[in-house]
């Protein structure tokens, strides 16, 4: 057990680490809401590793961005099992329109730690990109988080 100094109770090591990552993500989120952008992959992966690391099941999330690539909202849309999460383009599109997003960045974690995207990851990314393009919402990247991270944009897959 680890004592978390800001709070007066004991947490397991995993809970402690998750809490620290959440607090780091909140600090980064405030930076991006105030005007910094997600135009650089390094900014994106730094933020997403804090948000998605440490889960024992897959999480698919979306960063909804304005025209200047500033954060409107980060939202975990789908939760899955240890090695898969079902993703529904209709729900992603609905959320993007609801917050009036001009662009999005997709993200999900691989609890195994291996960030290498699967063929299923590549297929759903293309389906999402096709659906969002119908309403002029740009897909800037899809980042897979494990022990490190992989950017679809950096690999030229978008």
UniProtKB/Swiss-Prot annotation:
UniProt keyword annotation of Metal-binding present: yes
Lineage top rank: taxon: Bacteria
Keywords from the named record: Hydrolase, Metal-binding, Metalloprotease, Protease, Zinc
UniProt cross-references to PROSITE patterns, sorted A to Z: MPN, UPF0758
Amino acids binding Zn(2+): 108, 110, 121
Motif JAMM motif: positions: 108-121
GO biological process: proteolysis
InterPro entries, A to Z: MPN (IPR037518), RadC_JAB (IPR025657), UPF0758 (IPR001405), UPF0758_CS (IPR020891)
Pfam families: RadC
UniProt signal peptide: none
GO MF annotation: an example: metal ion binding
Domain MPN: 37-158
Similarity-based family: Belongs to the UPF0758 family.
Name of this protein: UPF0758 protein VC_1786
Organism: Vibrio cholerae serotype O1 (strain ATCC 39315 / El Tor Inaba N16961)
């Amino acid at each position: 057990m680890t004592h978390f100094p800001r709070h007066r109770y004991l947490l397991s090591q995993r809970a402690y680490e998750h809490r620290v990552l959440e607090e780091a993500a909140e600090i980064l989120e405030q930076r991006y809401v105030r005007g910094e952008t997600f135009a650089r992959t390094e900014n994106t992966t730094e933020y997403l590793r804090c948000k998605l690391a440490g889960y024992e099941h897959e999480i698919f999330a979306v960063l909804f961005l304005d025209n200047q690539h500033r954060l409107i909202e980060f939202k975990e849309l789908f939760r899955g099992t240890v090695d898969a999460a079902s993703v529904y383009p209709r729900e992603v599109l609905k959320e993007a329109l609801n917050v009036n997003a001009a662009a999005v960045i997709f993200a999900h974690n691989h609890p195994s730690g291996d960030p290498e995207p699967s063929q299923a990851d590549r297929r759903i990314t293309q389906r999402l990109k096709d659906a969002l393009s119908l309403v002029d919402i740009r897909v800037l990247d899809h980042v897979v988080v494990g022990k490190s991270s992989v950017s679809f944009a950096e690999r030229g897959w978008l």
